């Protein structure tokens, strides 16, 4: 389960970087529902709600020792104003950030720690990964990886013993064949962020509803890619309309169909859909019972979408 949304608001200047409408009581119910329906991987970050997402995870999973917690570092944030204050990835900060995350999730061990700077140059990232390697040796984290959409960045670190995971954007709108191929060749787990296109692929915006201000999706489309001024991008809305019926094959909801599209892409792909309610968490987890979309449906979707060539990598 992706835990960006439950963290609530945080900001980059005047631009919202978090989700609106999060309610702590319902967020806790969502986390419990996810667990009860078979979810075992929970993805968060030190910046989600200025650490609030991690604290909620710590509370909800206090007696769930086999829960897999993935967290991220790389941005400094003012906890009082919830303002992002800039990238930080020097070794001392990496250690400090991991310590703070451990306190917030109330554990002495985090399963996977990811660098949360998508397009950081490889040479600048090296010291951070050296530090993470030392933290693996110290038993503080289980392994580490990079949240990046750049295959070359992941490839540059894949030789490291503790580098286990690449988190990247991928969904029915934006395929990522180069990253998938690399991850499979190198034996890396793929954590898929934005598997539901920040909500567009749930179908709940098909009736014209929009996201209010104070939400990351109400910001400029060139920053988050799926919404323009609080409404789904017109081209994505058209694509959603075109494939909606195919996604619901076998009794799936549109959201479950979109997740099953990802499951059909390979056994090393692990979508991390977000949820702000228990109902959403249960629905998302229900995709596991359906399993991958049938091959014939996958072909029909590709024929309808007529994707352009992948093109050069870019941050998504």
Residue ranges and their predicted role:
Residues 1, 27, 42, 57, ...:
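Conserved, mostly hydrophobic/aromatic
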Residues 1-67:
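N-terminal binding-site loop/beta-alpha segment at the start of enzyme catalytic domains
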Residues 11-25, 80-95:
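Active-site mouth loops of central-metabolism enzymes
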Residues 30, 91-102, 243:
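Short, well-ordered amphipathic alpha-helical segments that serve as non-catalytic structural scaffolds
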Residues 36, 58-68, 102-106, 136, ...:
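Acidic (Asp/Glu)-rich catalytic clusters
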Residues 66-79, 113:
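A short, structured active-site edge motif that brings together acidic residues
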Residues 102-121:
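Active-site groove signature of glycoside hydrolases
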Residues 117-315:
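Beta/alpha (TIM)-barrel catalytic core signal, keyed to glycine-rich beta->alpha loops juxtaposed to Asp/Glu
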